[in-house]
Amino acid sequence: MNYDNKIKMFFEGVEKAGNTLDLNLIDSQFADQFIFADPSGTRVVEKQKFLPFLPKRQEFFKSIGHQSTKISSLEETPIDDQYTMVKAHFLMQFQKASGELTEAKLDSTYILFMKGDTPRIVMHIEPEDLQQAMKDRGLL
């Protein structure tokens, strides 16, 4: 089953929530527990412990000049009737201390549970270590 419009609308919400730090919207987008994976490994995350961390994450990004994040494209791969995998391509804009604007392209992969009114993130995969990715792009 292809969920094109449902996925598009969901990720418009992900983009909005990320740019505005809308914790209520973020709360509605994640399962109560989800798996987070990055180059250092995987871990099960309790959503209620994750949400209080997000303002600190936003402060980190602001400290390196983050202006906005946009989703440039989505690639959906249905798994079955209940789950779909979505690779999201993000374009992040930063303003360096010099005033120069720069962009960083980052990807994330999500496994979404599709039952119910709105999808829920049950797994979030970051292929790069975030701090290293920022260093590699000259932002740290």
Task: Name each model-derived stretch.
Residues 81-92:
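A short hydrophobic beta-strand element
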